[in-house]
């Protein structure tokens, strides 16, 4: 069973008090529509402490990295040990989680169109081997010297899911036919759901147009004195 916990990583634990449109149409609606779920916000210090506890000596592999890269490995440990929902703070929401899962659901794996498996939305029972394997792959790639946020994060996640479920590594953007086959195979497994999304407006937790999401996100980051991890803005 998936525990009703929402994991958010953000540098301000009072973010729900924000009047930013991104939060109004996202995190606030998520909390409002799912009152029986426990929201847990972890700031940078919480993430550092959690990684030190769970990684032990392997923490040295994460220590020099950007906080975004640390959050990527943190979410894998969180999902494996605790389960629930990990979601990026910039996701829009107007649909309850109640219609997405039931007592038999073990994992929901959205796909970002036919590009890759969504790395910003993880919904699972604890003890999922996908997350265990993802941690192992992350550690192995760090030991090999990799430090790219995208490669260690979203791309490694795609590689691990496909290797765990299909015994072969399938790279990002494998084509419509391949993703159709993968979704069909995953949905045939009891307890698993794989749903195609067209983010940011058409996802498993949002339907319809909510305004200029890109501008909402940029404004929210600016209000918090942050730059996007890509450095583009």
Regions found by a protein language model. Give the residues of each.
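Glycosyltransferase-associated regions of secretory-pathway enzymes
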Residues: 1-71, 87-233
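Solvent-exposed aromatic/hydrophobic patches embedded in short alpha-helical segments
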Residues: 70-84
């Amino acid at each position: 069973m998936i525990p009703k916990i929402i994991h958010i990583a953000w540098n301000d634990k009072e973010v729900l008090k924000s009047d930013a449109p991104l939060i109004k149409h996202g995190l606030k609606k998520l909390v409002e529509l799912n009152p029986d779920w426990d929201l847990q916000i972890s700031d940078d210090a919480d993430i550092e402490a959690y990684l030190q506890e769970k990684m032990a000596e392997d923490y040295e592999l994460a220590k020099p990295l950007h906080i975004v890269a640390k959050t990527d490995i943190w979410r894998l440990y969180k999902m494996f040990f605790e389960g629930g929902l990990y979601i990026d703070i910039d996701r829009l929401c107007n649909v309850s989680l109640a219609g997405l899962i039931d007592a038999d659901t073990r994992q929901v794996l959205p796909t970002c169109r036919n590009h890759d498996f969504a790395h910003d939305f993880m919904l699972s029972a604890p003890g999922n081997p996908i997350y265990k394997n993802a941690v192992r792959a992350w550690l192995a790639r760090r030991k090999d010297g990799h430090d790219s946020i995208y490669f260690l994060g979203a791309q490694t996640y795609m590689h691990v899911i496909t290797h765990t479920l299909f015994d072969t590594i399938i790279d990002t953007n494998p084509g419509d036919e391949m993703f159709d086959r993968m979704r069909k195979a995953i949905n045939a497994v009891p307890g698993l759901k794989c749903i195609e999304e067209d983010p940011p407006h058409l996802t498993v937790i949002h339907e319809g147009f909510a305004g200029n999401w890109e501008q909402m996100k940029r404004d929210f980051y600016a209000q918090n004195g942050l730059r996007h991890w890509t450095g583009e803005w």
